[in-house]
């Protein structure tokens, strides 16, 4: 019933907080009993789960390192033209791409031009004309929080896809030309000697399309006998000779004048 004097003294020494009473076995009550982690099969899986997932963690770290390397890779520099058309005697270019240092522009007729290799992305720049800072009003501009007006330019990879394709084509053409101009095999200084069979080789046969002479074709009944059929374009500007008959040689030639064809016949007695 109630606290003893010794308990009251102890309570006063602890600031009015009563310590939990232990039973004869040295334990505390069920409500104040501390939680003790017992060994179990689930605990073993819990402690070794990191070792089981180690390969997946290594793959993730490797992927993250590759991603960081790709992000840090410098963008390809692209040739960019800067032009000042506002006149002046001395014009300089300054921008975020050169830490706002002055770069002199080259005079070309009435303009000032500079070509710089800039990385892909957004860049700001200004012109220093005859001792005065200014910007080009015909180009895009951007205004800072301090009220400074600068020109802005976007260097995009898509703007140079045509040039990249032309460069690839030129490289392919150069490779083909090198292969075609330098066939494989040994090279020497000995002159080429014609073989006997090559010296007495017969002339080439007449192309077959030249054998279709319009003067040898029969004119249809429905056609005007005074008109010849339209010749093939390969028959033009050629001289044809008919076999000699009755001591007369017949020569013919067909020419084109705009959309008309004119065939001339020449009869020569032999």
UniProtKB/Swiss-Prot annotation:
Among InterPro entries, the record links this protein to: AMPK1_CBM, ASC_dom, ASC_dom_sf, CRP1_MDG1_kinase, Ig-like_fold, Ig_E-set
Q: Which ranges form a coiled coil?
A: none
GO molecular function of the protein, one example?
A: protein kinase binding
Compositionally biased tracts (Basic and acidic residues): 21-36
Map out region (Glycogen-binding domain) in residue numbers.
68-163
In residue numbers, the region (Disordered) covers 1-46
Q: Which residues carry this modification: Phosphoserine?
A: 5-6, 24-25, 40, 96, 101, 108, 182
Per the record, its GO cellular-component terms are: cytoplasm; nucleotide-activated protein kinase complex; nucleus
Residues the record lists as Phosphothreonine modifications: 4, 19, 148
Q: Which GO terms describe its biological process?
A: cellular response to nutrient levels; fatty acid biosynthetic process; nail development; positive regulation of cold-induced thermogenesis; signal transduction
Lipid (N-myristoyl glycine) linked to which residue positions? 2
Task: Cite the entry's keywords alphabetically.
Answer: Fatty acid biosynthesis, Fatty acid metabolism, Lipid biosynthesis, Lipid metabolism, Lipoprotein, Myristate, Phosphoprotein
**Source species, domain of life:** Eukaryota
| UniProt modification remark | Phosphorylated when associated with the catalytic subunit (PRKAA1 or PRKAA2). Phosphorylated by ULK1; leading to negatively regulate AMPK activity and suggesting the existence of a regulatory feedback loop between ULK1 and AMPK.
Q: Which family does it belong to?
A: Belongs to the 5'-AMP-activated protein kinase beta subunit family.
Written domain comment of the UniProt record: The glycogen-binding domain may target AMPK to glycogen so that other factors like glycogen-bound debranching enzyme or protein phosphatases can directly affect AMPK activity.
* Role summary: Non-catalytic subunit of AMP-activated protein kinase (AMPK), an energy sensor protein kinase that plays a key role in regulating cellular energy metabolism. In response to reduction of intracellular ATP levels, AMPK activates energy-producing pathways and inhibits energy-consuming processes: inhibits protein, carbohydrate and lipid biosynthesis, as well as cell growth and proliferation. AMPK acts via direct phosphorylation of metabolic enzymes, and by longer-term effects via phosphorylation of transcription regulators.
User: Quaternary structure?
Assistant: AMPK is a heterotrimer of an alpha catalytic subunit (PRKAA1 or PRKAA2), a beta (PRKAB1 or PRKAB2) and a gamma non-catalytic subunits (PRKAG1, PRKAG2 or PRKAG3). Interacts with FNIP1 and FNIP2.
Q: What is this protein called?
A: 5'-AMP-activated protein kinase subunit beta-1
- The organism encoding this protein is Pongo abelii
